[in-house]
């Protein structure tokens, strides 16, 4: 029968073959025709690299099938795979091999089915659809092979008494199933169980995989007491204390209960709920603190500490503060010393602008730290926007303005609808939800305004099944936007999509015009297999 072999240059070779020919034989025929040594040939069919010892019929290659020929750079490379038993396997690979190919090579050597293999490199689990070069795996790198146990995984459940229970589960188990397993082991009725993971209470109808709970994750079990009410107090060390309270208890009473449990004097306790510091004379119900609410406990250090504030003129001010002081409090102290109104002050620490409602300890500002004080000019700052026609527009803005706000100001001045505006700064397209300060756009910076043409253009996306999708796009659309349009049409999540054009994988942050993708170009869509557990 005849088959075709297509090279990366676009040339197609026709070969006479038998279904019983090995891949090695086929490479020999290609060498006769094209002079390419077999050890430099890699043959791909249906997205899989073909192995020398297998036959065409093994791969279901039939008459007039097309194989793709990719040249190996001479020599390839060796990598090592270390198993949990300590055994090390050596593999011959190419940087362009997918993780799937590597698992197939491990199966050939060790007989372990790919679906039981998990490969780890640099602490990351490797996904089947990615290549070794995607993960920067180079010659003589060592991967770690962990076996998945068939039929599920173990997780741990830790109770408030400190006891840890081990459960056998599946990623597809619901939280309800998990509570039933806990009842089997511990006799606690499900309606008295609350399960917490990553600070979130888990809902009965959801599955473990919905919450990204993987093998050997630890859940926390909190019991609901019938009647009365429990609240939780979380300390900065991460410890959680459970208290029995009444809605009519004052904050003072609550601090006394914390003192009983933890020995911390009330005058060193600050309690925070919903971002607010709680006042001693108020009650829990005043703050709408209900059963199972979590308060945060911050300790006041006795006697405070000193910090320094450096102004742009070079002057340094010394302030007496507490770690629990808010940035607002600090600005008030600066006003007392220097007469500068708080709304004209911007405080910077470790390159970050500090927000009024946060505390010094939130930013890990410790004794003798130095903050930098920058004055806001009343009425913000000016920036310039340059259009492609060469016209320059001046705008009054604040560093905290979003790109969306800026586009609205341009619309006010120039009448250009925001959805036709693309703003560029330092070579980057600016995203609507970000602020000027996120992009370090300062006074008298110049942005460039590029107009999106209405009407756009059509491109085609071809899937591995051969289906072709038509999309309406703009040259200024990012690859991320294109993946979102594919999701709208086909329901494929963007993180499972890889788009290829002219042999290159396209990166999310780039635009179609960056890749010179023009109207009626065809992109190829390859699906990433999910990594799973």
Swiss-Prot record:
There is a cross-link at residues 6, 11, 27, 29, 33, 48, 63 (Glycyl lysine isopeptide (Lys-Gly) (interchain with G-Cter in ubiquitin)). PROSITE patterns: UBIQUITIN_1, UBIQUITIN_2. GO terms for molecular function: protein tag activity; ubiquitin protein ligase binding. The modification Phosphoserine is found at residue 65. InterPro entries: Ubiquitin-like_dom, Ubiquitin-like_domsf, Ubiquitin_CS, Ubiquitin_dom, Ubiquitin_ubiquitin-like. Residues 533 form a propeptide. It holds the Pfam family ubiquitin. One of its GO terms (cellular component) is cytoplasm. GO terms for biological process: modification-dependent protein catabolic process; protein ubiquitination. There is a cross-link at residue 76 (Glycyl lysine isopeptide (Gly-Lys) (interchain with K-? in acceptor proteins)). PANTHER family: UBIQUITIN (PTHR10666). Belongs to the ubiquitin family. Ubiquitin is encoded by 4 different genes. UBA52 and RPS27A genes code for a single copy of ubiquitin fused to the ribosomal proteins eL40 and eS31, respectively. UBB and UBC genes code for a polyubiquitin precursor with exact head to tail repeats, the number of repeats differ between species and strains. For the sake of clarity sequence features are annotated only for the first chain, and are not repeated for each of the following chains. This is Polyubiquitin-C. The gene is UBC.
């Amino acid at each position: 029968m005849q088959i075709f072999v297509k090279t990366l240059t676009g040339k197609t070779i026709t070969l006479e073959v038998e279904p019983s020919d090995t891949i090695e034989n086929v490479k020999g025929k290609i060498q006769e025709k094209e002079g390419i040594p077999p050890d430099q040939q890699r043959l791909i069919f249906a997205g899989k690299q073909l192995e020398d010892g297998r036959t065409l019929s093994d791969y279901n290659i039939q008459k007039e099938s097309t194989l793709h020929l990719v040249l190996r750079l001479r020599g390839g490379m060796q990598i090592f795979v270390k198993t949990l038993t300590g055994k090390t396997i050596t593999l011959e690979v190419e940087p362009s091999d997918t993780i799937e190919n590597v698992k197939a090579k491990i199966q050939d050597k060790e007989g372990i089915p790919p679906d039981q293999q998990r490969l780890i490199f640099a602490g990351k689990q490797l996904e089947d659809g990615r290549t070794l070069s995607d993960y920067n795996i180079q010659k003589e790198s060592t991967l770690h092979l962990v076996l998945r146990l068939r039929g599920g995984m173990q997780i741990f459940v830790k109770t408030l008494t400190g006891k840890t229970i081990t459960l056998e589960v599946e990623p597809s188990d619901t939280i309800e199933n998990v509570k039933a397993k806990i009842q089997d082991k511990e006799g606690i009725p499900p309606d008295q169980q609350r399960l917490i993971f990553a600070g979130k209470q888990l809902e009965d109808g959801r599955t473990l995989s919905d919450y990204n709970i993987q093998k050997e994750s630890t859940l926390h079990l909190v019991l609901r007491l019938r009647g009365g009410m429990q609240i939780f107090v979380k300390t900065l060390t991460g410890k959680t204390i459970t208290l029995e309270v009444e809605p009519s208890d004052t904050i003072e009473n609550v601090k006394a209960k914390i003192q009983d449990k933890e020995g911390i004097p009330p005058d060193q306790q600050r309690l925070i709920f919903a971002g607010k510091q709680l006042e001693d004379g108020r009650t829990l119900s005043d703050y709408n603190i209900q059963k199972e609410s979590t308060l945060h406990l911050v300790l006041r250090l006795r006697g405070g500490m000193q910090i320094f504030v450096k102004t742009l003129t070079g002057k340094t001010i010394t302030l007496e503060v507490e770690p629990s002081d808010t940035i607002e409090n600090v600005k008030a102290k600066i006003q007392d010393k220097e007469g500068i109104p708080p709304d004209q002050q911007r405080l910077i620490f470790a390159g970050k602008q500090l927000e009024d409602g946060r505390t010094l300890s939130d930013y890990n500002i410790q004794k003798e730290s130095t903050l930098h004080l920058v004055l806001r000019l009343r009425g913000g700052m000016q920036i310039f926007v340059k259009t492609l026609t060469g016209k320059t527009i001046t705008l009054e803005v604040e560093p905290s303005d979003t790109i969306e706000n800026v586009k609205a100001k341009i619309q006010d001045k120039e009448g250009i609808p925001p959805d036709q505006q693309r703003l560029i700064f330092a070579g980057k397209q600016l995203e609507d939800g970000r602020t000027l300060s996120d992009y370090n756009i300062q006074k008298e910076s110049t942005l460039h305004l590029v107009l999106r043409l209405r009407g756009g253009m059509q491109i085609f996306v071809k899937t591995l099944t051969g289906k072709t999708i038509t999309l309406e796009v703009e040259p200024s659309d990012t690859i991320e936007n294109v993946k979102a349009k594919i999701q709208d049409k086909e329901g494929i999540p963007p993180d499972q999509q890889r788009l290829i054009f002219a042999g290159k994988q396209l990166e999310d942050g780039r635009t179609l015009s960056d890749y010179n993708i023009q109207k009626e170009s065809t992109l190829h869509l390859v699906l990433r297999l999910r990594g799973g557990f």
